[in-house]
């Protein structure tokens, strides 16, 4: 990727950069776009699939110019079929539908092939990120990408979860479009955002779609990036995204949030294994910050869980309050001093922080942070159990072993 600074795009430069993306070749380095602080008209925190899927579907069904979906996990099932039906209906109305999905998370060339054939036959343009050979196609049933190893691309997984409707409504969160997020087995959230900041989400999507070989007519640029009314856009909000290489604005922001907290700090994450970030959490607690760490009691990755639990003793000794949510807590969020909220897809483990495509929304608003506490943190705290230290020589040895392996997990 080269410089970690990336390409700085100001508020007036988004259209210019988008036009370059739509008319010329796009390399991986062109995805490294760093945005200045933006503005949102509204930011809503929606917790659990039963709360975020219905309005997300309603937004898709209301689309009049375009629907863009970037999803790590979009698979057949009750939830997936409902979304597929909504997308097919828009295609029948003549609305362009574009998708970027991850080969590992969505399996569009394997078990979900029929599901994606239905979408592409209806007219959806689908690009696939393949961690071993990130070569593109319009549709998922072309050349057999992924059969040939490309070690340089190993780990280039697209972990993002984004929906952009008409360039005016954006969704960013941690959940896939899959049944286990809709039936309560996985506990997650999405942020629904409107206002000028949606242009940033749209540009990130367009950059990835074009890098993967998708075609977007430059004549539609005005529809893709409609002029947003700034009059009511008073909420500071900025899109941060990581890309493979050395472009890691989310990682930088997480470190700053952990280091800058002075009064309170909430960390919500299913995979807390990065030693450097864990030490930052400990230091925050030691300097008197009230720290709550929300993690799952029953994680879906037992190796990561063992590595994480290895650090519980040091975290507890530092004064961190560990809260284990009873089901698979899958959300990723940070709240600093009741004012700053960072939420999206990035986990506190090495691959997310340094290798995957990730996306978060940074919101600097006491009212949005309070909304997060009311809808997520307070209810989660009420049903969570205190985190425990590993007990017994065997349990501690297993935890220590997996902690050593955590950069690979």
Q: For each predicted feature, which ranges?
A:
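Charged, low-complexity intrinsically disordered terminal segments
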Residues: 1-409
């Amino acid at each position: 990727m080269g410089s970690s600074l990336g390409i700085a795009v100001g508020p007036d430069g988004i259209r210019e950069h988008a036009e370059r993306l739509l008319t010329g070749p796009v390399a991986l380095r062109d995805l490294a776009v760093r945005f200045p602080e933006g503005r949102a008209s509204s930011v809503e925190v929606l917790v659990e699939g039963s709360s975020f899927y219905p309005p997300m579907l309603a937004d898709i069904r209301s689309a009049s110019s375009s629907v863009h979906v970037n999803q790590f996990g979009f698979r057949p099932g009750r939830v997936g079929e409902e979304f597929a039906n909504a997308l097919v209906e828009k295609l029948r109305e003549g609305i362009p539908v574009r998708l970027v999905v991850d080969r590992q998370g969505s399996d569009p060339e394997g078990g979900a092939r029929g599901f994606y054939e239905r979408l592409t036959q209806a007219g959806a343009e689908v690009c696939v990120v393949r961690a071993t050979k990130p070569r593109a196609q319009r549709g998922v049933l072309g050349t057999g990408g992924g059969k040939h190893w490309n070690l340089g691309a190993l780990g280039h997984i697209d972990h993002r979860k984004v929906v952009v409707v008409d360039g005016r409504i954006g969704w960013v969160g941690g959940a896939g479009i899959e049944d286990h997020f809709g039936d309560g087995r996985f506990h997650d959230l999405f942020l629904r955002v409107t206002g000028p900041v949606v242009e940033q989400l749209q540009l990130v999507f367009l950059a990835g779609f074009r890098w993967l070989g998708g075609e977007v007519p430059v004549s539609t640029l005005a529809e893709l990036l409609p002029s947003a009314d700034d009059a009511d856009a008073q909420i500071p909000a900025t899109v941060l995204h990581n890309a493979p290489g050395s472009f890691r604005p989310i990682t930088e922001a997480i470190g700053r949030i952990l280091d800058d907290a002075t009064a309170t700090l909430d960390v919500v994450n299913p995979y807390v294994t990065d030693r450097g970030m864990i030490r930052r959490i400990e230091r925050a607690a030691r300097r008197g910050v009230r720290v709550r760490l929300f993690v799952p009691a029953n994680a879906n990755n037992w190796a990561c869980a063992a590595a994480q639990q290895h650090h519980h003793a040091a975290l507890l000794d530092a004064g961190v309050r560990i809260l284990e949510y009873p089901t698979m807590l899958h959300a990723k969020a940070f709240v600093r001093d009741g004012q700053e909220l960072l939420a999206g897809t990035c986990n506190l483990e090495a691959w997310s922080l340094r290798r995957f495509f990730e996306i978060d929304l940074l919101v600097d608003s006491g009212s949005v942070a309070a909304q997060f506490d009311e809808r997520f943190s307070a209810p989660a705290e009420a049903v969570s159990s205190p985190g425990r230290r590993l007990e017994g020589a065997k349990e501690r040895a297993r935890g220590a072993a997996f902690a050593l392996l955590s950069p690979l997990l």
